[in-house]
Amino acid sequence: MFQLLRCVPRVLGTAVAGLRAAAPSLPRLQPASRPCARPFGLLSVRARSVQLPGLLKPRGPCACGCGCSGLHTEGDKAFVDFLSDEIKEEKKIQKYKSLPKMSGGWELEVNGTEAKLVRKVAGEKITVTFNINNSIPPAFGGEEEEPSQGQKAEEQEPELTSTPNFVVEVTKDGSSKALVLDCHYPEDEIGQEDDQSDIFSIKEVSFQATGESDWKDTNYTLNTDSLDWGLYDHLMDFLADRGVDNTFADELVELSTALEHQEYISFLEDLKGFVKSK
């Protein structure tokens, strides 16, 4: 019985092999041909034979004829010429070739557009910090005066004056707190000096931890808009006793104006070099 079962697979295998040999071979299915939607010539772009649009266009010599391969237009050349003339004119009217010194024994430290004045007296350190950015007040609108006879129009232009906000920080030896007074030049007081009036005012007063560059908003800040005038006068006298008075404020305007003009000329020179660079 077992011998008959073993013979069955062999017999079936022989029969299937015979049927395969007798049946005709069918052709294999081939995929239908489809025309290419994009010509192969466009797949490989040649810079010499095909004109590339926009940013793909090969970079050639600049339009002004200097021979450089960078973006350099006739407008850039005119811009550089204008900046050259502007720098010459600004240097002609530059009042201070070097920064003026402050009276009263103040030591000056300059870091870019930020300046710091430091003074030590009787166990106290007074630090005044200001920044010249956005320190020139805008010109007030109004009817322009016509130049008088024999006077050129450019002579009528007002002199630009830098009146920055400044912060006075007073620290005492051995104290962990600093008294900070935020001061500014009121616009209506600029150019209207009086022997009895202050040319600067205190906006805010607060205590801050010494040695910290970032002051905390969680510390109480006193706004002087609603301050008792008696307390305000004592604060102004407190500053005057430490050398921050009208004379100091006048000299600070001179220093800030000189620094602002110096940085403006440096900016024009950097701008000229940037536009001119290849």
Curated annotation (Swiss-Prot):
It comes from the Eukaryota. Residues 73-90 are annotated as: C1q binding. It is found in: Mitochondrion matrix; Nucleus; Cell membrane; Secreted. One of its GO terms (biological process) is negative regulation of mRNA splicing, via spliceosome. The keyword DNA damage applies. GO terms for cellular component: cell surface; cytoplasm; cytosol; extracellular region; mitochondrial matrix; nucleolus; nucleus; plasma membrane. InterPro entries: MAM33, MAM33_sf. Residues 136-164 are annotated as: Disordered. Belongs to the MAM33 family. Multifunctional and multicompartmental protein involved in inflammation and infection processes, ribosome biogenesis, protein synthesis in mitochondria, regulation of apoptosis, transcriptional regulation and pre-mRNA splicing. At the cell surface is thought to act as an endothelial receptor for plasma proteins of the complement and kallikrein-kinin cascades. Putative receptor for C1q; specifically binds to the globular 'heads' of C1q thus inhibiting C1; may perform the receptor function through a complex with C1qR/CD93. Homotrimer; three monomers form a donut-shaped structure with an unusually asymmetric charge distribution on the surface. Interacts with CDK13, HRK, VTN, NFYB, ADRA1B, FOXC1, DDX21, DDX50, NCL, SRSF1 and SRSF9. Interacts with CD93; the association may represent a cell surface C1q receptor. Interacts with KRT1; the association represents a cell surface kininogen receptor. Interacts with CD209; the interaction is indicative for a C1q:C1QBP:CD209 signaling complex. Interacts with FBL and RRP1; the respective interactions with C1QBP are competitive. Probably associates with the mitoribosome. This is Complement component 1 Q subcomponent-binding protein, mitochondrial.
